[in-house]
């Protein structure tokens, strides 16, 4: 696969996964009976852990190639999605906390590594193409939100929906 296509695919998958999760937050809130404050507290942990994931990915990229890290971290996002669905189905708060931590760490580390790869592609091509990668992310976020909305309308469980997303997005 050509480097630009591969990095575009990484941005696309990340946008789709993120929007799929965010669009289904009301179902998670309903399943657990979270108040607005409780939900805000749970969700605040995701970007905090994502920041940790970004820093760790940056540190590890010195030792391993960012493409290798990107593949591994994308698996964390997929696992986080599936575990989020399973936690919601089982109404297990400890499992949900673990799932959101996996998602946060995975999202942050994927963000860092896919941007590292994007910079590499720019150097390879000799011109700026980062905006096109972010456009793929945005398109995927729209499609992910639409897919999540359609899944909610058909009563597909979170576990079922997130499992499909995980299988499709992680090659």
Residue map of PLM features:
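Hydrophobic core of transmembrane alpha-helices in multi-pass small-molecule transporters
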Residues: 12, 93-110
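Primarily marks hydrophobic transmembrane alpha-helices of the MFS/SLC 12-helix fold
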Residues: 67-74
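Residue-level signature of mid-helix packing/kink "hotspots" within the transmembrane helices
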Residues: 47-55, 141-142
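Intracellular juxtamembrane helix-capping segments at the cytosolic ends
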Residues: 108-123
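C-terminal ends and interior cores of transmembrane alpha-helices
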Residues: 75-90
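Helix-to-loop junctions at the C-terminal end of transmembrane segments
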Residues: 53-66, 152
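Pair of pore-lining "gating" transmembrane helices in MFS-fold secondary transporters
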Residues: 1-26, 30, 101-102
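Symmetry-related core transmembrane helices of the 12-TM Major Facilitator Superfamily/SLC fold
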Residues: 159-171
